[in-house]
Amino acid sequence: MAAAVRFQVVRALPMSRPAISAAATSVFCSSSHRQLHHAVIPHGKGGRSSVSGVVATVFGATGFLGRYVVNHLGRMGSQVIIPYRCDIYDTMHLRLMGDLGQLIFLEWDARDKDSIRKAVQHSNVVINLIGREWETRNFDFEDVFVNIPRAIAQASKEAGVERFIHVSHLNASMKSSAKSLRSKAVGEKEVRTVFPDAIIIRPSDMFGREDRFLNHFANYRWFLAVPLVSLGFKTVKQPVYVADVSKGIANATKNPDAIGKTFAFTGPNRYLLFHLVKYIFGMTHRTFIPYPLPRFVYSWIGRLFGLSPFEPWTTKDKVERIHISDVMATDLPGLEDLGVQPTPLELKSIEVLRRHRTYRWLSSEIEETKPAKTVNY
């Protein structure tokens, strides 16, 4: 009876939190300590919650390539400063790409040098992805590809930025028939002059879910036929997957051998434009009806479309760019030198082109489409 009374008294006494912890510890410590082999414990990168040591300012992050670059930087645990000129709601899709507090959004003015300095002052990596498909009354190609990159490179140099990465184009040349490619060539020269150790990336035409390459040709279905200069038999293209480009840029931020080099990012295969467009229409299960159109007529049509106050369907400059063959930059390092294996077009094109199919063919297998013929020149 006494024991029972004592038991009731003990239960009635309130136990503090330290007493509970001590009691629990005494129970678990009495058992033998369990040894775990190190192979059982998970290892690897910490992902978005890790700290990569990279503090990167990404200009042009709201564009096609920018969202992939921000995602790869966030995945490796980098802090990313995102200058933006658009409405704040147009940046919402980027907010999920980094851990809490790792993405910093900063409104900036491309013609205000103080806002550029503010965007790069705390970064050790600056990436310029700014680009434009057509000219506007506010920004022409010289502003977009020459003046703004030069101002960003100058501000980065003054701020002591360790790495400056500038994205150009594979076909950038002073002798190009396309004004945008001539401007990009001048921009490369200006960036290299201001920031000699800059890393210059020259990707070919990029394809991906939101691209203006595969989607552009697929949208020709609305015109019932596809106009091509010389039917596309004189143009060779080597498109590259956008995720490969962004992964290469992310790897360049950490690769010590990349400083001061120019890289050419291309896909693994080269295609005649005719066979490439034929493959696009085959993937969408649409009838491919090509017809030859003289270059000067096509350029004149592009000039008319370029007069639109809205986003133009095509422009004179785009007509020129489409029909310029991709150079074979065998003398420049590529994606493989940054640890990236280029992805074939045939593996990822369905992600872009499925939405152009009718309901009847929406779920058909990609194996039903014959791959595009490749060339070696």
Curated annotation (Swiss-Prot):
Binds 1 FAD per subunit. This is NADH dehydrogenase [ubiquinone] 1 alpha subcomplex subunit 9, mitochondrial. Its main location: mitochondrion. The gene is Ndufa9. Keywords: Acetylation, Electron transport, FAD, Flavoprotein, Mitochondrion, Respiratory chain, Transit peptide, Transport. It comes from Rattus norvegicus. It is found in: Mitochondrion matrix. Acetylated on lysine residues. BLOC1S1 is required for acetylation. Acetylated by CLOCK in a circadian manner. GO terms for molecular function: NADH dehydrogenase activity; protein-containing complex binding. Residues 1-35 form a transit peptide. The modification N6-succinyllysine is found at residue 175. Expressed by the principal cells of the epididymis. Detected in flagella of epididymal sperm (at protein level). The modification N6-acetyllysine is found at residues 189, 370. Complex I is composed of 45 different subunits. This a component of the hydrophobic protein fraction. Interacts with BLOC1S1. Interacts with SLC2A4. Interacts with CLOCK. Interacts with RAB5IF.
